[in-house]
Regions:
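Intracellular loop-helix junctions on the cytosolic face of multi-pass helical membrane proteins
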Residues: 1-7, 100, 104-108, 123, ...
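Intracellular juxtamembrane helix-capping segments at the cytosolic ends
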Residues: 122-135, 422-436
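C-terminal transmembrane helical hairpin of 12-TM major facilitator-type secondary transporters
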Residues: 384-426
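Loop-to-transmembrane helix entry/capping segments in MFS-fold secondary transporters
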Residues: 43-44, 137-146, 351, 435-447
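C-terminal ends and interior cores of transmembrane alpha-helices
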Residues: 82-103, 391-404
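Helix-loop boundary and gating motifs at the non-cytosolic
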Residues: 2-56, 309-313, 317-341
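Helix-to-loop junctions at the C-terminal end of transmembrane segments
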Residues: 59-75, 368-382, 466
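Hydrophobic core of transmembrane alpha-helices in multi-pass small-molecule transporters
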Residues: 92-123, 408-422
């Protein structure tokens, strides 16, 4: 038995919630550096303040993936998590603009970023698996393309909203230490947008029950919990010990090499995973029943080959994206608009231009997902399509390094937008057709590790590199971003060899 084929409105309803989620992400990505700098953070403080975002994704997504694979109640399998995350994100978006009125505004803003990113991840992670749950294999590419179009459209609205408010007469400049009304109102609008969009998907879709999913044909078989326990029991703890040693080496390198203290977080995460790996092995050898830890550790160590090779691509792809989100505002305001004074009209004009630039790349992504990517995929296949798009994005980052004209940067954003569309669609379409249906949640959550880890590296190591070699010159980060996407494009050549000749 095959799943029913979804028409236009079916595809629309399945992914519309992502529109609201991406409004929230866009407001976060385009405005949080501005918020932090306005509240007194220096350029060197930004990576540490941003570290909350990837860290929450690293923790939240595998857990939510595991839980959603095993959830079934009146709301369904994935929808309970959509709704919970949307409510929490709306609260964080509402409270964020109140930071200047709090006794410790910078700490409060960082805490709200943590809550916001965790909440958006709670909503976002099940949406990735939701497309695979609801669609037959031959509609996976179309489903993720529609999802990407909504991501682009939501990001366009979230990115452009402060700029639109300014042109409607809302104040874009505020006293020192206060947020402009354009930013405040944009965050409150985002709170409403995410609730409305997610509620739409929750109430216009019906998830297939576990029994219905089991009856559908054409899905890759999943390892059962017993096989995972047996695989863990057969493992040696040397791998966990190696992770712990790596964490200790990273921690020692902080003092030896004079790295920023945020790098300690990376060392701690490596050591913690090593400990969890050893604990999971011991529990398996004792005959402990399958649990969340054994599932996450076991599935991580037993990833299918195609997922392992795509993980390398994701690592370099998201390194560049996080560099862009942190540094575009400082680069544009300093090099194009000539100001680092957050209370100046020039700085705020440049910060709003960043919203326009982010609107362009997200708008391009929305169009490319529906028009360009399907054409390229039919002509060259999904693997070569992704490689081509990443190359175009790398050229866009090079433009930021060399160009000093605000309008010329729009051309750069076209290449970045095409690459962004492909990053959001192609890897997930490939995975959804080659992973066990019953484990889409946990595998999509684990795949997020290779989105989060590079962001943590950027948030910790990049600050040390810039401080040591390019102090006060954030434009060099764009060269790092270009190199990262060039490496990702080359890494895609290894992916095709891991895709089975016959997919389910």
């Amino acid at each position: 038995m095959e799943k029913p084929r979804q028409g236009f409105w079916g595809l629309w309803n399945i992914s519309f919630g992502f529109f609201g989620i991406q409004v929230g992400f866009a407001l976060q990505n385009a405005n949080m550096s501005r918020v932090f700098q306005t509240l007194g953070a220096s350029m060197d403080d930004l990576p540490a303040l941003w570290v909350a975002a990837p860290l929450t994704g690293l923790i939240v997504q595998p857990i939510i993936g595991h839980l959603s694979d095993r959830t079934w109640n009146r709301l369904g399998r994935r929808r309970p998590y959509f709704l919970t995350g949307a409510i929490m994100a709306a609260i964080a978006l509402f409270l964020m603009p109140l930071a200047p009125t709090i006794a410790a505004p910078l700490v409060f803003a960082a805490a709200m970023l943590w809550v916001l990113d965790a909440s958006l991840n709670i909503s976002m992670e099940p949406f990735r698996a939701f497309v695979g749950d609801m669609l037959r294999t031959d509609q996976h590419a179309a489903g993720y393309a529609v999802q990407t179009a909504f991501i682009g459209a939501g990001a366009v609205l979230g990115s452009i909203f402060p700029w639109l408010l300014e042109h409607l007469g809302v104040d874009n400049v505020a006293p020192e230490g206060a947020l402009p009304n354009t930013v405040r109102y944009a965050f409150w609008f985002g709170a409403v947008a995410i609730l409305v969009a997610v509620v739409w998907t929750v109430f216009t879709t019906r998830e297939y029950s576990p029994e219905e999913q089991a009856a559908f044909s054409g899905h890759v078989a999943a390892d059962d919990d017993g096989e995972i326990i047996a695989r863990l029991a057969a493992k040696k703890p040397l791998g966990g010990i190696a992770w712990i040693v790596a964490g200790v080496i990273v921690a020692l390198a902080v003092d030896l090499l004079g790295l920023q203290k945020e790098v300690l977080l990376l060392g701690a995460l490596l050591a913690i995973y090593g400990v969890l790996d050893i604990v999971a092995i011991r529990m398996a050898r004792r005959g402990t029943k399958p649990n969340m830890l054994s599932s996450i550790v076991g599935d991580f160590s037993g990833m299918p080959p195609v997922m392992k090779r795509l993980a390398l691509v994701q690592f370099f792809s998201w390194s560049a994206l996080f560099i862009m989100w942190i540094n575009t505002t400082p680069v544009v305001t300093q090099y194009v608009f000539g100001s680092t004074d957050t209370a100046s009209a020039a700085y705020n004009e440049g910060a709003n231009w960043v919203n326009v630039l982010f609107t362009v790349y997200n708008g391009v992504a929305a169009v490319a997902a529906l028009v360009l990517l399907p054409w390229l995929s039919r002509r060259f296949g999904p693997v070569r399509t992704h490689s081509i798009c990443l190359t175009l994005g790398a050229l866009g980052f090079l433009g930021f390094f060399f160009l000093r004209d605000a309008n010329a940067l729009i051309v750069c954003e076209i290449g970045i937008g095409i690459a962004w569309a492909s990053i959001l669609a192609m890897p997930y379409a490939i995975l959804a057709s080659n992973l066990p249906q019953a484990k889409l949640g946990i595998y999509m959550g684990l795949f997020n590790i290779f989105i989060v880890v590079p962001q943590l590296l950027v948030a910790t190591v990049m600050g040390s590199i810039m401080l040591a070699f390019f102090p006060g010159e954030p434009v060099w980060t764009m060269l790092f971003a270009a190199a990262a996407w060039a490496v990702a494009a080359l890494a895609m050549t290894r992916v095709s060899a891991a895709i089975p000749a016959r997919t389910a």
